[in-house]
Swiss-Prot record:
Limits of the Reverse transcriptase Ty1/copia-type domain: 1353-1491
Name of protein: Transposon Ty2-OR2 Gag-Pol polyprotein
PTM comment text: Initially, virus-like particles (VLPs) are composed of the structural unprocessed proteins Gag and Gag-Pol, and also contain the host initiator methionine tRNA (tRNA(i)-Met) which serves as a primer for minus-strand DNA synthesis, and a dimer of genomic Ty RNA. Processing of the polyproteins occurs within the particle and proceeds by an ordered pathway, called maturation.
Annotated InterPro entries: DNA/RNA_pol_sf (IPR043502), Integrase_cat-core (IPR001584), PolX-like_BBD (IPR054722), Retrotran_Ty1/copia-like (IPR039537), RNaseH-like_sf (IPR012337), RNaseH_sf (IPR036397), RVT_2 (IPR013103), TYA (IPR015820)
GO CC, alphabetical: cytoplasm; nucleus
Major site of localization recorded for this protein: cytoplasm
Subunit record text: The capsid protein forms a homotrimer, from which the VLPs are assembled. The protease is a homodimer, whose active site consists of two apposed aspartic acid residues.
List of catalytic residues: D457
Record lineage: Eukaryota, Fungi, Dikarya, Ascomycota, Saccharomycotina
EC code: 3.4.23.-, 2.7.7.49, 2.7.7.7, 3.1.26.4
Binding-site residues, Mg(2+) 1: D667, D732
Motif Bipartite nuclear localization signal, residue numbers: 1193-1227
Organism: Saccharomyces cerevisiae (strain ATCC 204508 / S288c) (Baker's yeast)
Misc remark: Retrotransposons are mobile genetic entities that are able to replicate via an RNA intermediate and a reverse transcription step. In contrast to retroviruses, retrotransposons are non-infectious, lack an envelope and remain intracellular. Ty2 retrotransposons belong to the copia elements (pseudoviridae).
A GO term for molecular function: RNA-DNA hybrid ribonuclease activity
């Protein structure tokens, strides 16, 4: 930009504030703020010309260029008078006239310097018009005019006009303000103020000076009259009259994206190129688009641009896709170069055809020279030679080929070494170059390589390739040696041929060597000449001797290259062991077989062991070792996967001085859970320091006696077998080693006990590493064999035998050899899990089969036999009477890592052990007792229980082998650990816990805390075996909104137990309800209302039933009617609070009985009913079920067993299996299934990128998701989510700081499609966030309370949404995000700047950000104890992530908050809430209908109508509606569920969907369904037909009642106080193990705002104790709600608690402490007294018939259910 000068007018000390330069013509598609040249008014060329001829005079001073606009003496800037702008010493019109305003009446140039411009001026009017051109602030203009402009005929004028800025047109209307701002910003940019204009985020590049501030302020006022400004601009200026930059910032953010940007994105996404146009044209087109986007502040990365270009390539350019597919560092320039090369190649081929070459005279005199070959004539064209006659291309500097072998044709390959210099001789030239001076030595850069091309090398005698992809007929190399330029050997992996398919169908083949140790793929020119192919470097082609062009060659850098597209890929599979066996090693054993036989030991250990003869009957030469070092065993990879290597060098140095067996290392591993009682849960290992000999012993427990027995055994073994004495034993500091018993044992025997020091795990490395090794082997062996987990110790023992027999990499001998023992006899070893057939020499019948299928485990310790597992008999035997089962068509395993069959090899190894030996096998058990296996009914098995009488006949059935394929593997069932022995007699007590594996439950998502049971309402379902088994009845306690927003979360199960009596039919004709009583004196049934399945005595008859002495009996003084409703409060205010005032306006059922305050005994004549205690319809088990044992022909399961699946896939895919059973069944036990509900995976409602876009067949939906995707990308870039200026290399960043990312898509409730870019916070490292920070959202009770108060006080309710809320919160930690997968930046990372969705800390960061803004900028305060509830004197705000609900009496107060929020956040008004008619909201999933001063209705009809039919549940199959979700008297069958694996997973997934949706609805507003929902949630892992029917029935009831709403009416205006009431109820002992169900319902001013149903945490011993527990659970939440109500509404509050237990009220009121039966009960009651008296709580009695909390504790009959709910749910 030319330097320009501004002249000062000596007659004008105060010049104008205006400056202007004419803007250049800018295309409209380049800048949304550009001003078209056609819109510029004409200027007076003559006056401009005159002004341009002025010279600097002594009276004027030239102002030097100042790019920073810094004035040495900045002056204050008082604003001028302009309409409504504030006045601060304005100039008068006369002064303005003197200030040269009159000069602006003519289109002449102002002569004053901008540094002398005064900010004080008078607003121009018709007498003082605006100037047409204004001198700029700087002498540099950002927009020079093109010299070829339309005004070029007046060069002088044009030159001068270039120094002027065209002022923006005056602002004329409020609606066009955004358009005018574009011109005004362009005006400021042309005035050299672009770097101080804020962007839409309010960021500026530098601070402005006072003069610049005055310049902007004055020009804005001059062209934008105050009365024409929009309201929001006026509001800003009213606060700060000079804050023009804020106005510009907000204006920029409001501008819509330019249409040209969208067009450029579409053009870039739809690029296509096939070579029809020149490559240069295509490059210019793409570069222009990218440049335009860059001008609009949209940076397109090279990676993204390359991907879009590659997508549109076709024809010969298409192969570039594969070339760039695996590249991460894409460069756009490199891709354009590749396209240009291909375009040039095609162009050359079109010009150079064989018929044309012979016609041109320029090719006729081409010299032909034959190279130094005897067999083949080779012709080359037009290249320069060295002094030798052999033609040479440019040499590759990375290799000098030198051969030391004979070629196939016995021709010796000439040795030649290429110098490291570019040209070693002055006369040596590259082909196709003129002779020049020799070049200096240089190093080849790896960037010189041309990808997917072969370097044509004249110095290489052999062709070398780095990839075997193109190598045909490859054979392993054993003879050829190649050296590089430094005479270093280059290893050659294989020898083969390269097949070329040139143009015109010419095919040829040359020999090539495969090595990955070269920089380029080298194509030997001499190899080409042997095939009559020559290189013409004049025309850059490969030709035949007759001149036919075969292919073009490319000059790139200093070399010539041939494209690999002419190579034919090799489709021959890699060399396999089969191929090697057939061709070279017919009699050798394949390495995978030996690897399996030797316990999956590593390659080095096996090879070294064979060299040292540690394994007999097998030599190293007997095994095929090719590729053994690189062989990957999938079972080893899975079973031995580790995080990192164990600490090396942890052994102390002095330990090496001991002799063999003097220094032992020991450690205990365990426990292994979920095993049968007979299987060991621990093992203790010993390792000798010197020999590294290893022992393992099984343990069932870690008691002192068990450990002592093992130490006694091993010390005796070492003393007798090795004649050695143990001196030192090193152990850790576990209690099993540091106890007095073991210490005394060591002291008596003179053994030093060496313990590790505190936190010194390194000193115990030998034992720790042994345990890790044994467990790795154990997992691998079990996985490979598919055997059940209870055989885990057999795998450990097998591994110990193998490890003692192999040489470790650090030793020269095996442990057995060090110990002086013979090597392992390989003929005695079978692969772990090898299928065998065991001879049954004592069958039950002579016609029964003599063979029993089994699986070999390990050699016996106590005999010469083998330990074999017999699944059909559930036992292991020690026998030699077995034969190996062969199957020549099976695979080794499901990974198919080789396709060999090892039967023949195995037969050769074990040939002399294949015959049966009679009467010599013994049975093996884990306690090492040996017995005979002659009698298979001796019951030495893994899962042993006394068998019924007819078991033997069943086990020896003639069809035993036919039924054998249906394999059942029993795993433990779980029972409650708290059950005492008398509770489960006559079965034995089990202490082990089960483990029900649910793969889906551990993958993602949270957990749901669930403790409920489920009702069943079906008269058609009959209990199996005429009994009513129980089910767990623990209720879900999910009052927090956080727990229910995403369906099922945090399901915690509890134990099942209890007994249940048969159902007593209720007489529906009588109006008298009977309560159950118990003859046991210790149980008080005075207020028992827990069992709706039995007749219940009404409250009037209650006194007559209380004939059982109890500690909870009311004192005599409270048995009269005078004390029926005791008032707990002693203060003066209590005299105005009565039971009627508490019960008034509550939605209780209308009954004709006496008031609850009347306790007159009207039922004293009714006889007392004696009945046994029964459980509710869905809890406990029949007494008959407890007292009887199963008498089945099949062996009964133990109490801690359940049958688990043997996968069919495991049977089908194992190579060494005996039989393939039909489809196996999975047996599920009810108790184990319920207790296995640890964490249920929530149903995924979102879609991945491939599901939503890539493979989405719904084009309309796909388009919507694509649109949402682009919108999300734009938002992320707009919010500066990550640092776009730099990409970080993945290898340079700490992996802990790297967060994975992904796109998720979903459809919102309003039908819009949403895309969200999220971080994988579920795998975020704990060190990258502060675990103390919590992401808070408004509690659902707080929202319901706020809505209730809003109804009673006629509040306006406004709903807001903040877009991309989390992205407004900065992130403090240093974190890096993986870019989205579709960008292809696999090795690059982005530095996060904002709190991306999904991060652990994002929610907490956003909460702190919005909380700070609401407090500091909106004058709000957070309510103590209730997060995300904010209030001030006028407005209450409930915050749920990015949703805000505003409550206020004055709608303008809400609007004021909205205005403040919009200054900082992109705030959308979902529903302003104005008007007096009914307004509908969708607030956090609730569909709310609200009419101020009248009512509020909460429901989910629209959502349920849409979602329920999609659950694939048959709705209304019989066309009639259900009247209740369930009824009492129905029981969940406890019989084990036998189901296919796939069907089981499918049903569990279905249960998750159904219960997840039901749970969401229940905790929103359908509190009447909570008991039923949570009951079924406990049975998700037990999806029997009965459970599914009950679930379908619940969904059906929800469908039939989907239009039901929670109805609230405005409180009566005569009520001056707020009334908060909790209604409590408990069902005594109706839950498993006699636990009680408790429930509470909370009401504010007669409106139900919440409900809770859960199981009592402790077992209650009476109904009163259960009721006390229920009341104690309600009081804390009641107090918290009371505090919230008082904060939100300053009215006085009355707190009441209603219960139908008089004894509970008596205990709360009484001061007598002598009757408390135990300390716990007493402290509970005393605390309850303190809470009631200290919190001004009124406790009153309510009739059971009116107790609406009854629906929270038990299933009710239809009539009772409707009676208790129809007042508040209808």
């Amino acid at each position: 930009m030319e330097s320009q000068q501004l002249h000062q007018n000596p007659h004008c000390p105060h010049g104008s504030a205006y400056a202007s330069v004419t803007s250049k013509e800018v295309p409209s598609n380049q800048d949304p703020l550009a001003v078209s040249a056609s819109n510029l008014p004409e200027f007076d060329r003559d006056s401009t010309k005159v002004n341009s001829q002025e010279e600097t005079t002594p009276g004027t001073s030239a102002v030097p260029e100042n790019h920073h606009h810094v004035s040495p003496q900045p002056a204050s800037v008082p604003p001028p008078q302009n309409g409504q702008y504030q006045q601060h010493g304005m100039m008068t019109p006369n002064k303005a006239m003197a200030s040269n305003w009159a000069h602006y009446q003519q289109p002449s140039m102002m002569t004053c310097s901008h540094y002398q411009t005064s900010p004080a001026y008078y607003q121009p009017d018709p007498h003082y018009p605006l100037p047409q051109y204004i001198p700029p602030l700087s002498t540099s203009s950002p927009d020079p005019i093109d010299s070829q402009d339309q005004h070029s005929e007046v060069p002088q004028a044009k030159t001068k006009v270039r120094n002027n800025v065209l002022p923006p047109h005056p602002h004329t209307s409020e609606e066009n303000f955004s358009t005018w701002v574009k011109f005004y910003i362009r005006f400021l940019k042309n005035s050299n103020l672009g770097d101080i204009i804020p962007n839409d985020q309010g960021e500026i590049k530098r601070q402005m000076t006072y003069e610049e501030h005055a310049y902007i302020y004055n020009t804005f006022q001059a062209f934008a009259p105050f009365h024409l400004l929009p309201t929001w601009v006026k509001q800003i200026l009213e606060i700060n009259y000079s804050d023009i930059l804020t106005v510009l910032c907000k204006s920029v953010s409001k501008m819509q994206t330019n249409n040209q940007e969208l067009k450029d994105w579409i053009a870039l996404a739809n690029l296509e190129y096939n070579g029809s146009t020149s490559a240069d044209t295509f490059e210019i087109t793409v570069s222009t688009i990218i440049q335009r986007l860059k001008e609009n502040n949209i940076n397109v990365s090279d990676r993204l641009a390359c991907q879009l270009i590659l997508k549109g390539l076709s024809g010969d350019f298409k192969y570039l896709r594969n070339q760039y597919r695996t590249k991460t560092n894409m460069k756009l320039s490199q891709l354009f170069a590749e396209i240009q090369l291909i375009y040039d190649e095609n162009k050359i081929m079109n010009l150079n055809k064989p018929s044309q070459y012979k016609q041109h005279s320029e090719y006729k005199n081409v010299s032909r020279t034959s190279p130094n070959t005897t067999n083949t004539k080779v012709t080359t064209r037009n290249y320069h030679r060295t002094n030798s006659s052999k033609p040479r291309a440019a040499k590759a500097h990375n290799i000098a080929t030198s051969s030391k072998f004979s070629r196939v044709n016995n021709d010796h390959i000439n040795e030649s070494t290429v110098s490291s210099q570019y040209l070693s001789d002055d006369n040596e030239l590259s082909l196709g170059q003129q002779q020049k001076e020799s070049k200096p030595t240089r190093t080849i850069d790896s960037n010189d390589e041309l990808p997917d091309h072969l370097l044509i090398d004249s110095g290489a005698s052999q062709t070398l390739v780095r990839s075997a992809h193109y190598l045909h007929h490859a054979t392993p190399n054993s003879e050829i040696n190649i050296v590089d330029a430094q005479k270093q050997d280059i290893p050659i992996n294989a020898i083969g041929n390269l097949h070329f398919n040139f143009q015109n169908g010419t095919k040829t083949s040359i020999k090539a060597l495969h090595t990955p140790n070269i920089a380029y793929d080298l194509l030997s020119l001499s190899e080409l000449t042997n095939q009559n192919i020559t290189a013409c470097f004049t025309r850059n082609t490969l030709e035949r001797s007759d001149g036919t062009v075969l292919a073009p060659i490319v000059k790139h850098g200093d070399f010539y290259w041939l494209s690999k597209k002419y190579l034919i890929p090799s489709h021959i599979s890699k060399l396999t062991i089969n191929n090697v066996n057939k061709s070279k090693s017919v009699n050798k054993y394949p390495y995978p077989l030996i690897h399996r036989m030797l316990g999956h030991a590593n390659f080095r250990s096996i090879q070294k062991s064979l060299k040292k003869n540690a394994v007999t009957y097998l030599k190293e030469s007997d095994i095929e070792w090719s590729n053994a070092s690189t062989y990957q065993c999938p079972d080893c990879l899975i079973g031995k996967s580790t995080k990192h290597r164990h600490v090396k060098g942890s052994r102390l140095k002095y330990q090496e001085s001991y002799e063999p067996f003097q220094y032992l290392h020991t450690d205990i591993f365990g426990p292994v859970h979920h095993l049968p009682k007979s299987a060991p849960s621990y093992f203790i290992s010993f390792t000798d320091e010197k020999t590294r000999f290893q022992w393992v012993y099984p343990l069932h427990d870690r008691r002192e006696e068990s450990i002592l027995n093992v130490f006694t055994s091993i010390l005796a073994f070492i003393k007798n077998q090795f004649n050695a004495r143990v001196l030192v034993i090193q152990m850790d500091r576990g209690s099993e080693y540091t106890n007095k018993t073991l210490h005394k044992f060591f002291t008596n025997r003179g053994i030093t006990a060496c313990y590790t020091t505190t936190a010194d795990s390194r000193a115990h490395g030998v034992a720790e590493r042994l345990n890790r090794t044994l467990l790795n082997d154990c997992r691998t062996l079990l996985h490979c064999s598919g055997l059940p987990n209870h055989l885990w110790f057999s795998a450990v023992e097998f591994s110990t035998i193998i490890r003692n027999s192999l040489v470790s990499p650090k030793n020269d001998k095996s442990a057995r050899q060090h110990a002086g023992l013979a090597g392992l006899d390989i003929t005695t070893i079978l692969p772990f899990g090898q299928p065998v057939i065991v001879n049954n020499h004592n069958p039950d019948s002579k016609i029964h089969p003599r063979g029993i299928p089994g699986y070999a485990l390990h050699p016996s310790r106590n005999s010469y036999g083998y330990i074999i597992y017999l699944p059909s008999l559930k036992k292991t035997v020690d026998t030699t009477n077995y034969v190996i089962l062969q199957n020549n068509q099976t695979k080794l395993d499901q990974f198919d890592y080789d396709t060999l069959t090892f039967d023949d090899d195995l037969n050769r190894l074990t040939a002399h052990n294949q015959s049966f030996i009679e009467q010599n096998e013994t049975e093996q058990s884990y306690d090492q007792n040996t017995e005979s296996d002659h009698d298979y009914q001796s019951e030495i098995e893994i899962n042993s229980d006394p068998l019924v009488n007819d078991f033997s006949s069943q086990s020896l059935n003639p069809l035993q082998l036919d039924k054998e394929p249906v394999q059942k593997v029993r795993a433990p069932k779980e029972v409650d650990a708290d059950i005492s022995e008398y509770n489960i007699l006559p079965s034995t007590i089990r202490s082990r816990t089960p483990h029900i594996i649910n793969k889906e439950s551990t993958e993602m998502g949270g957990t749901i805390e669930s403790d409920t049971t489920s009702p069943r309402h079906s008269s058609t379902f009959t209990a199996r075996n005429q009994k009513r088994p129980g089910s767990p009845n623990d209720m879900i306690d999910l009052t927090s909104q956080d727990r229910v927003n995403y369906g099922l979360e945090n399901i915690k199960t509890t134990r099942l137990g209890g007994t249940e009596e048969p159902y007593i039919q209720r007489n529906s004709d009588t109006n008298i309800k009977y309560r159950t009583t118990n003859s046991t004196p210790s149980i008080d049934d005075r207020s028992s209302n827990s069992d709706s399945t039995t007749p219940i005595i009404s409250i009037e008859t209650k006194a007559a039933c209380d004939n059982t002495p109890s500690i909870d009996t009311d004192p005599p003084e409270y048995r009269s009617s005078d004390h029926a409703t005791p008032n707990i409060m002693p203060d003066k205010s209590s005299k105005n609070v009565t039971a009627d005032s508490i019960l008034d306006d509550l939605p209780l059922p209308d009954l004709t009985h006496k008031s609850p305050t009347d306790t007159s005994d009207v039922s004293k004549d009714i006889p007392h009913i004696h009945s046994r205690q029964t459980n509710s319809s869905l809890g406990g088990m029949d007494d008959s079920n407890v007292l009887t044992t199963t008498k089945s022909k099949k062996r009964s399961l133990e109490d801690n067993e359940t049958e688990i699946e043997v996968s069919r896939d495991t049977w089908n895919n194992k190579n060494m299996r005996s039989l393939e059973p039909p489809r196996s069944k999975k047996r599920i036990n009810l108790i184990a299934a319920i207790k296995g509900v640890k964490s249920i995976k929530p149903v995924r409602t979102t879609l991945r990128y491939d599901e939503a876009i890539t493979y989405n067949k719904d084009n309309k939906e796909k388009d919507r998701y694509v649109e949402a995707y682009h919108k999300e990308i734009s938002q992320l870039l707009k919010m500066n989510t990550w640092d776009t200026n730099k990409y970080y290399d993945r290898n340079d960043i700490d992996p802990k700081k790297v967060i994975n990312s992904m796109f998720i898509f979903n459809k919102k409730r309003d039908g819009t499609h949403k895309a969200r870019f999220v971080a994988r916070g579920d795998i975020q490292h704990p060190d990258t966030y502060d675990s103390d920070m919590q992401s808070n959202t408004v509690h659902h009770y707080a929202l319901m309370t706020s809505l209730s108060i809003a109804l009673d006080n006629d509040y306006y309710i406004t709903q807001l949404d903040i877009s991309s809320a989390y992205l407004y919160a900065d992130i403090k930690e240093e974190l890096y995000i993986r870019p989205p997968p579709h960008l292809g930046l696999n090795d690059k990372l982005l530095r996060l700047r904002k709190s991306l969705y999904g991060l652990k800390q994002s929610g907490a960061n956003w909460y702190e950000t919005i909380k700070s803004y609401l407090i500091n900028c909106c004058d709000m305060q957070e309510v103590r104890g209730w997060s995300c509830v904010f209030k001030n004197s006028q407005v209450t705000i409930c915050l749920f992530v990015d949703d805000m609900i505003l409550f206020s009496k004055d709608l303008n107060a809400n609007k004021k908050i909205i205005t403040t929020l919009k200054k900082q956040y992109d705030t959308k008004i979902i529903n302003l809430g104005e008007g007096d008619n009914e307004i509908q909201y969708d607030i956090l999933g609730l569909e709310i209908k609200y009419q101020r001063s009248k009512y509020m209705k909460l429901g989910m009809e629209k959502s349920l109508t849409e979602k329920l039919p999609k659950l694939n549940v048959p709705l209304n199959p019989k066309g009639k509606k259900l009247r209740a979700p369930g009824q009492p008297g129905h029981y969940i069958d406890q019989d084990e569920l036998e189901i296919d694996e796939d069907e089981y997973k499918e049903k569990v997934h279905e249960m998750q969907k159904l219960i997840g949706l039901a749970s969401y609805v229940g905790y929103k507003f359908r509190f009447d369904l909570l008991y039923y929902i949570n009951t079924l949630a406990q049975h998700i892992l037990f999806p029997s037909r009965q459970v599914l029917d009950m679930t379908y029935e619940l969904i059906q009831f929800m469908w039939d009642t989907r239009d039901k709403q929670l109805i609230w009416h405005k409180n009566k205006p005569t009520k001056p106080d707020n009334k908060l009431v909790a209604i409590s109820d408990a069902s005594y002992g109706n839950q498993p193990y006699y636990k009680s169900q408790i429930g509470n319902i909370f009401l504010l001013n007669g409106k139900v705002i919440g409900g809770k149903s859960t199981k009592a945490s402790l077992t209650c011993t009476s109904t009163t104790e259960a009721e006390i527990h229920a009341v104690s659970e309600a009081i804390p939440l009641l107090n918290n709600l009371s505090h919230l109500v008082q904060e939100l509404n300053k009215k006085p509050i009355i707190k009441g608690l209603l219960t139908d237990s008089r004894s509970t009220i008596s205990i709360i009121k009484s001061t007598n402490e002598e009757k408390f039966r135990n300390r716990f009960f007493g402290t509970k009651a005393m605390r309850l007294r303190d809470e009631v008296s200290g919190n001004n709580l009124y406790v009153y009695y309510i009739e059971t018939k009116k107790n609406i909390a009854d629906v929270m504790t038990k299933p009710l009959p239809i009539k009772t259910f409707k009676l208790l709910t129809n007042k508040w749910i209808h």
